[in-house]
């Protein structure tokens, strides 16, 4: 079983944990529809950066 050789101080422990915080997904609002979506992703209705890039409903 692993046993530490020297006790880690609260400061060292907290410095190690400083990178453990979780962040939520970054959301953007579409300029055309006002819909929220993930950054650098197409919205559900097919718009990306104000342009229609996917025609949903027309299966070719």
Curated annotation (Swiss-Prot):
Family: Belongs to the bacterial ribosomal protein bL32 family.
Organism: Cellvibrio japonicus (strain Ueda107)
Name of the protein in question: Large ribosomal subunit protein bL32
Gene Ontology annotations of biological process type: translation
GO cellular component, one term: large ribosomal subunit
Basic residues composition-biased segments: 7-16
Region annotation Disordered: where it falls in the sequence: 1-28
Any one GO MF annotation of this record: structural constituent of ribosome
Biological classification of the source: Bacteria, Pseudomonadati, Pseudomonadota, Gammaproteobacteria, Cellvibrionales
Keyword Ribonucleoprotein in record: yes
Pfam families assigned to the protein according to its UniProt record, in alphabetical order: Ribosomal_L32p
UniProtKB keywords: Ribonucleoprotein, Ribosomal protein
Keyword Ribosomal protein: yes
InterPro entries linked: Ribosomal_bL32 (IPR002677), Ribosomal_bL32_bact (IPR044957), Ribosomal_zn-bd (IPR011332)
């Amino acid at each position: 079983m692993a046993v530490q050789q020297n006790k880690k101080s609260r400061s060292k422990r907290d410095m190690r944990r400083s990178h453990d915080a979780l962040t939520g997904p970054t959301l953007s609002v579409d300029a055309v529809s006002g819909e929220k979506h993930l950054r650098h992703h197409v919205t559900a209705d097919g718009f990306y950066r104000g342009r229609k890039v996917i025609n949903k409903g027309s299966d070719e």
